[in-house]
Amino acid sequence: MKPSIVAKLEALQERHEEVQALLGDAGTLADQERFRALSREYAQLSDVSRCFLEWRQVQEDMETARLMLSDPEMRDMAQDELLEAKAKSEALEQELQLLLLPKDPDDERNAFVEVRAGTGGDEAALFAGDLFRMYSRYAESRRWRVEIMSASEGEHGGYKEVIAKISGEGVYGRLKFESGGHRVQRVPATESQGRIHTSACTVAVMPELPEAELPDINPADLRIDTFRSSGAGGQHVNTTDSAIRITHLPTGIVVECQDERSQHKNKAKALAVLGARIHAAEVAKRQQAEASTRRNLLGSGDRSDRNRTYNFPQGRVTDHRINLTLYRLDEVMEGKLDALIEPIIQEHQADQLAALAEQE
C-alpha cells in the first residue's frame, strides 16, 4: 500500500481514538448536539479503524513469517503462513480503498422520489403506478416511511405523476441510481390482439435537504397559483382552493401539491419539493461539467437516460447501464430491488476507484 495512503489511514485511526475519548467526556455529554455529531463521526470512522488495525496486524504477521523462513525446520510452515497473510493483506487493502472513497454527503438523507408517465398514454400511467408500488414495497422491506407529497392520477388508474418523500436510514444512497428512464414492454389489458406495447416512465430521486442547506429562493422569483383539488377526498374536494402550483420563474421548474386539505400544508410541501428540485438541477449541472473529461458509465440520471427495460412476456428486467439481465421480474415488481441496486453501487465504486487511480 502506498505510504501516502498509510499516512492518511494513520491520521483517521488517531481521530477515531480522539473521538472515542471525547464521547466519554462529561462536557460532551452535556452538549447533546455535539454528542450526536461526534457519535455520527465515530460510527463513520469505526469501519476504517477496524480494517486498518487488522491490516497492520497482518503486516506484523508477514514480517514474523519472513524471519521464520531462514529456519529450515520452520520454512514450510512459514511459507504457508506468508501466503495466507499476503492474501488477507490484499483483501484488506481492497476493503480500505473502498472505505476511503469520497462519501456523498447526501447518501444518508431522506429522498423525494418522483415517477412520471412518459410516452404510452394510459399504459404509461399504469406502469408509473406499478413503479411507485415497487418502490413503496422496497421501502417497506427496509422499514422506511413513504409519504405522498403530490399525485396526479391517470384516467384509467396509475399516475400521470406522483411524488413521495421516503424517510429512513440511507434512503438517497440506495435509490439515487434509479433516476432516469424506465421502459416497459407488455400486452395492455385493453389489447385484444395480444400485441406487445412499449411505454416509458421517468424517475427522479432527489435528497431532502435540511432547511439551512436549501437553495436561497427569492419570493419574487415565484409564481404561486391556487386551484381546487381534484381526485380522492370525498366532500372536501372542489369546495376550497387548497391546491397549490408553484412556478420558479428563473428555471421554469413547476411543482403542484394538492394532497392536503390545507392550502398552508400544500404550500409547505410544494416548497420543500421545489428546493430539492432546484438543488438537484444545480448538482446535475456541476456533475455534467466534472464528467465532461471522463465518461461515466452510469449516466447522469437525466430523464433521457435509459436505465432499465421491464419485459413482462419474457419475465425479464435489463439494466442497460451495466448490461445486467435478470429473469425475476415478478420479484422485482414486488419490491425485491437489491439484486439490481447492489451491482449499480459496486459499478459506481469501481468508477470512483478508476477516477482516483487516474488522479494519482
Swiss-Prot record:
The modification N5-methylglutamine is found at Q235. It holds the Pfam family PCRF. Residues 286-313 are annotated as: Disordered. InterPro entries: PCRF, Pep_chain_release_fac_I, Pep_chain_release_fac_I_sf, Prokaryotic/Mito_RF, RF-1. It is found in: Cytoplasm. The keyword Phosphoprotein does not apply. SUPFAM superfamilies: Release factor. It comes from the Bacteria. One of its GO terms (cellular component) is cytoplasm. SMART domains: PCRF. Keywords: Cytoplasm, Methylation, Protein biosynthesis. Peptide chain release factor 1 directs the termination of translation in response to the peptide chain termination codons UAG and UAA. Belongs to the prokaryotic/mitochondrial release factor family. This is Peptide chain release factor 1. It comes from Cronobacter sakazakii (strain ATCC BAA-894).
